């Protein structure tokens, strides 16, 4: 899919809201991989390492980290698409890798590189359980689904933001707050939300001298019924 290959793999090493992994049901695994491979060829050609559309990994340290993850997956026969790598060019072609559970090293950190782990789960309910078992994500993406399924995702998960049928685009809408929840951060900014977050809301109370509550001071003669009425 163009939105996954283009919008995700092109900027995966430069944004904190690129998908960390992809969850698909068994029936969609093969057609999705076929579509992603076609999109990759369309964008980067048959020799992606020499494409002028493919950027470099930012430095050698990050390249070494990604190379180690990639070669470990290659040794296990888990590369589904891509896997091309050039140390001289400091480039890694967009690569899709099979993972079998959340304990895989590829699922343990933000990759910041063109490696996309794919996890096959039976259905949406199982996928939502998997999401809830991990830290609350900064961004959550859902492709497809009817209105009921979309509402199920929105109401049973907690994340900084959600984008339906696309990735990353929510960060470009200034009217939408951007921020995390829990492990992914607290608070939000952009537009009015940014003004509120970075402003101090000072509380001010002014009371007149001519009226006071004598119940505040000793000797206390508390009428519980009166207090209950005052408390509503």
Residue ranges and their predicted role:
Residues 1, 70-71, 195:
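Short glycine-/small-residue-rich flexible loop motifs, especially phosphate/cofactor-binding loops
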Residues 1-6, 11:
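Single conserved hydrophobic/aromatic residue that forms the stacking wall/gate
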Residues 8, 40-44, 202:
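Short, well-ordered alpha-helical segments in soluble proteins
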Residues 15-16:
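Extended low-complexity, polyampholyte segments enriched in Ser/Thr/Pro and acidic residues
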Residues 20:
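Glycine/small-residue-rich pyrophosphate-binding loop that anchors the diphosphate of NDP-sugar donors
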Residues 91-232:
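Conserved C-terminal structural/oligomerization subdomain of aldehyde/semialdehyde dehydrogenase
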